[in-house]
């Protein structure tokens, strides 16, 4: 990573998610330089033109251009959004075979440039592909991050806020585990303005446990619902990627539920999975190990096991 004030972000993959991420970066003034790389040169160049035309309205001047892998050499963050798309009825894990092949080529090209920054992975299945990026790149684990369950956590907080009638930033809770079908809500730590959700259920009979079960189902299945209606999800994940990017560039040491590598935390080893982590200029420098209840521990173990079973045919895992 360059020891200078100019932050360069390279976006690989200018599809729905990548383009939305680029727009969010510029609209929020998060990066100084933005390089877009895509196999479809015309699409990427069109995005560059479109984004540059709105530069007069941006809060911060962002130099934006269509580039090549050579531009990764001076990059601080390379965000990978390239890969096969999730189709209706297809799980994120169904995409493994297709996207592992794509990623091996992409990561090889990036590393050949001399890149020494932070990888931010968005392509699904994100936990698997973040692990693959770590293996293919050879970078330290803290400098390879996936979007993980940051969006799931945001969805959770939004739906909690709607249910309890408060602002989203006053609804606190985490979704952890696989970004997918085995993710879990950490109800034992969920609270509204500091009041545990479990206490609110006891205090007011209008709040019901079955409502909260349905609420989580809506979190877990949100992507499927959106894909059914509009074909793809991209705004929410782009905003979560921008949030992670901002935390890195501003060295916020923000706690975000990214896909991070576990080395004994939560009783798991050698897996990338969505957990709260301290994110700053060095990447995901520390895992925040929550005190889970027994049910949550078992659910998390199951989620990690599902990911390891997918990884095992492709990588030699540590015990």
From Swiss-Prot:
Allosterically activated by fructose 1,6-bisphosphate (FBP). Homotetramer. Catalyzes the conversion of lactate to pyruvate. Its main location: cytoplasm. The gene is ldh. It catalyses: (S)-lactate + NAD(+) = pyruvate + NADH + H(+). NAD(+) binds at residues 17, 38, 43, 69, 83-84, 122-124, 147. Pathway: Fermentation; pyruvate fermentation to lactate; (S)-lactate from pyruvate: step 1/1. GO terms for molecular function: L-lactate dehydrogenase activity. It is found in: Cytoplasm. The modification Phosphotyrosine is found at residue 224. Keywords: Allosteric enzyme, Cytoplasm, NAD, Oxidoreductase, Phosphoprotein. It is an enzyme of class 1 (oxidoreductase). Beta-D-fructose 1,6-bisphosphate binds at residues 157, 172. It comes from Bacillus licheniformis (strain ATCC 14580 / DSM 13 / JCM 2505 / CCUG 7422 / NBRC 12200 / NCIMB 9375 / NCTC 10341 / NRRL NRS-1264 / Gibson 46). Its EC number is 1.1.1.27. One of its GO terms (biological process) is lactate metabolic process. Pfam families: Ldh_1_C (PF02866), Ldh_1_N (PF00056). Belongs to the LDH/MDH superfamily. LDH family. The active site is at residue 179. One of its GO terms (cellular component) is cytoplasm. Substrate binds at residues 86, 92, 124-127, 152-155, 233. This is L-lactate dehydrogenase. Coiled coil: none annotated. InterPro entries: L-lactate/malate_DH (IPR001557), L-lactate_DH (IPR011304), L-lactate_DH_AS (IPR018177), Lactate/malate_DH_C (IPR022383), Lactate/malate_DH_N (IPR001236), Lactate_DH/Glyco_Ohase_4_C (IPR015955), NAD(P)-bd_dom_sf (IPR036291).
């Amino acid at each position: 990573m360059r020891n200078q004030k100019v932050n360069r972000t390279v976006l690989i993959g200018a599809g729905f998610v990548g383009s939305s991420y680029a727009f969010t970066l510029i609209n929020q003034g998060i990066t100084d330089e933005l390089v877009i790389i895509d196999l479809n040169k015309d699409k990427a160049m069109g995005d560059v033109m479109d984004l540059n035309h709105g530069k007069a309205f941006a809060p911060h001047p962002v130099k934006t251009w269509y580039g090549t892998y050579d531009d990764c050499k001076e990059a601080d963050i390379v965000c990978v959004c390239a890969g096969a798309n999730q189709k209706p009825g297809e799980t994120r894990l169904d995409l493994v075979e297709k996207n592992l092949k794509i990623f091996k080529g992409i990561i090889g090209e990036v590393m050949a440039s001399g890149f020494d920054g932070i990888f931010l992975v968005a392509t699904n299945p994100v936990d698997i592909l973040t692990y693959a990026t770590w293996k293919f790149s050879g970078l330290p684990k803290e400098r390879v991050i996936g979007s993980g369950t940051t969006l799931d956590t945001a969805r959770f907080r939004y739906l909690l806020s709607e249910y309890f009638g408060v602002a989203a930033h006053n609804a606190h809770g985490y979704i952890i585990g696989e970004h997918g079908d085995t993710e879990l809500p950490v109800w034992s730590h969920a609270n509204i303005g500091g009041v545990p959700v479990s206490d609110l259920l006891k205090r007011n009979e209008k709040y019901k446990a079955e409502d909260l079960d349905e609420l989580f189902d809506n979190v877990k299945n949100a992507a499927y619902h959106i894909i059914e209606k509009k074909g793809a999800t991209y705004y929410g994940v782009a905003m979560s990627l921008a949030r992670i990017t901002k935390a890195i560039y501003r060295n916020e040491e923000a706690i975000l539920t990214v896909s991070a590598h576990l080395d004994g935390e939560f009783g798991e080893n050698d897996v990338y999975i969505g957990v709260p982590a301290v994110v700053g200029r060095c990447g995901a420098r520390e895992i925040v190990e929550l005190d889970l209840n027994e049910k949550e521990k078992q659910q998390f173990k199951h989620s990690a096991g599902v990911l390891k079973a997918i990884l095992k045919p492709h990588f030699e895992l540590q015990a």
